[in-house]
Amino acid sequence: MKHLLIVSLVFVTIIWKIECETDMYDDSSIVKTEETEEVKPCGLNEVWMVCSSCEEECGKTPQPCPRICQPARCQCPAHKGYRRDGQGNCIFCHDSVPKL
């Protein structure tokens, strides 16, 4: 039973990552918030996500992330090799940590 749960979790994570990589990322760097209608740029290497999700950190094993649309925000695009560093910056990581 434990193995079935692990296999199911890995399968769902892989499907989620494939779908995110193919249709969720928008590489625009200027954002317009609905509340204020003011234009704000994303930080270096970040992209604006209308439907954001969990982010990965350099040097840490990726954790399962529920497929729930979180509030719009600038996000670090993991599908391009970018992760958050210890200071919260979006940087390209040369990790040897395996992806789930």
Swiss-Prot record:
Superkingdom of origin organism: Eukaryota
Record keywords: Disulfide bond, Protease inhibitor, Secreted, Serine protease inhibitor, Signal
Domain TIL positions: 42-93
Disulphide-bonded residues: C42-C74, C51-C69, C54-C65, C58-C93, C76-C90
Predominant location: secreted
Gene3D superfamilies, per database record: Laminin
Cellular compartments per GO CC: extracellular region
GO molecular function: serine-type endopeptidase inhibitor activity
Secretion signal, residue range per the UniProt entry: 1-20
Compartments where found: Secreted
This protein's record includes keyword Signal: yes
Designated name of the protein: Serine protease inhibitor 1 protein
The organism of origin for this protein: Caenorhabditis elegans
